[in-house]
Amino acid sequence: MNLEETMPLVFERSIPGRIGFSLPESDVPETNAGDYFDQAYIRSIPADLPELSELEIMRHYTNLSNHNFGVDSGFYPLGSCTMKYNPKINEKVARFPGFANIHPNQPESSVQGALELLYDLQTSLVEITGMDEVTLQPAAGAHGEWTGLMLIRAFHEKNGDTKRTKVIIPDSAHGTNPASAAVAGFDVVTVKSNEKGLVDVADLKKVVGEDTAALMLTNPNTLGLFEKDIVEMAEIVHEAGGKLYYDGANLNAIMAKVRPGDMGFDVVHLNLHKTFTGPHGGGGPGSGPIGVKKELIPFLPTPVLTKKEDIYTFDYNYPDSIGRVKPYYGNFGINVRAYTYIRTMGPDGLKLVTEYAVLNANYMMRKLQEAYDLPFDQVCKHEFVLSGNRQKKLGVRTVDIAKRLLDHNFHPPTVYFPLIVGEAIMIEPTETESKETLDSFIDTMLKIAKEAEENPEIVQEAPHSTYVKRLDETRAARKPILRYQKEV
């Protein structure tokens, strides 16, 4: 079945003159828009908006929604994305009238409850990360990365250390790391991984110098491996005058067990939409708070939420601040959900999250290594990386395996990342999945590996049961069609 044949665009369903709404007669005089707006802003021809009945609109979008795939409908082992289940109590709390119906322009005195929640969330994140202060202002992970790097840049500039223009990043890092560093005005230097998949400390010593602003690390790293030499690496960077930046993408692997601040990190960003169950992957906005050690507090974006006696207030008196990085104070709704999750789980619950996430990943890794190559054969944390090189020799690529999983109602893992692993298959099961679900996925992966040996065509031509078959993904990325244009 071809989606283009069975489901036209809403514009293509349009019938001129068909009405899907009812408005009362206007009780005010008609006016000419040209009397109020410059002609440059007034359309010369009407907007080509779709004209449908309410029923047609309802059916169109309901049918579209039935083709969506999310964590509520199936297993979503997308490596490095922590696609865990989002508890619905989060949604209930976020819809409390005192949270849902307030406006950011209200006086502080009228939203003390909301400010108390944000302050308590900051305090919780300080404890979880081992930092000294947290701001909730950044909107998402990469935004948090950039904000943290801007703080580091401001710190060095305040100290007259303008020669520190380089940020060191491992060759296994998330792609956002070098991008954030570049946008923040830094040059990127790559440090190699060793044969165990960890940062090569000897190579780090070579690239660290007087021009080092920071080292950006994820721990555990993007291979799902814990950087056991982190304390030594922190000492190397600090002795050179640089700062240590923690990418919190993989906090789910160590939460409530160890703290980045205790490892020597100076700046941390978190992904509340991942680790702390805000909906993501198309389900809503993110939230990327950053935590800092004491000497970086003066540079935090303003305003800074503080508590004076029993009153919660925004403090703008930070003369060295990098300024605002987002209107108002972060994505409030996601912060409410994260706070609800933390309070629901408690310290012991957060420890169990980490333990189950690590257990699930190691269970799957050991079950799958018989059929797929395992580049780094050691205990992993919350995720692991396989290689499809064995299947590639049979004519089946990793992308084929990913497409074949769609036929079994599984979202594919992350593929071809990290870049240092050929035909990479990156799997993160999270803590919320049952053993039965894990076993079903394992059985499917083993079945696909067998198909690659005995009937490779069925894998090469997958998917077979989806509404859309193989798309030209390269063309879609390089020549996207972002708006509808009627054929004349």
Swiss-Prot record:
GO cellular component: cytosol; glycine cleavage complex
Gene3D superfamilies: 6.20.440.10, Aspartate Aminotransferase, domain 1 (3.90.1150.10), Type I PLP-dependent aspartate aminotransferase-like (Major domain) (3.40.640.10)
Listed GO MF terms: glycine binding; glycine dehydrogenase (decarboxylating) activity; pyridoxal phosphate binding
Modified residues (N6-(pyridoxal phosphate)lysine): K274
EC number: 1.4.4.2
Domain of life of the organism encoding this protein: Bacteria
Recorded family membership: Belongs to the GcvP family. C-terminal subunit subfamily.
Xref: HAMAP family: GcvPB
Purpose: The glycine cleavage system catalyzes the degradation of glycine. The P protein binds the alpha-amino group of glycine through its pyridoxal phosphate cofactor; CO(2) is released and the remaining methylamine moiety is then transferred to the lipoamide cofactor of the H protein.
Record-given protein name: Probable glycine dehydrogenase (decarboxylating) subunit 2
Organism annotation: Listeria monocytogenes serovar 1/2a (strain ATCC BAA-679 / EGD-e)
Gene of this entry: gcvPB
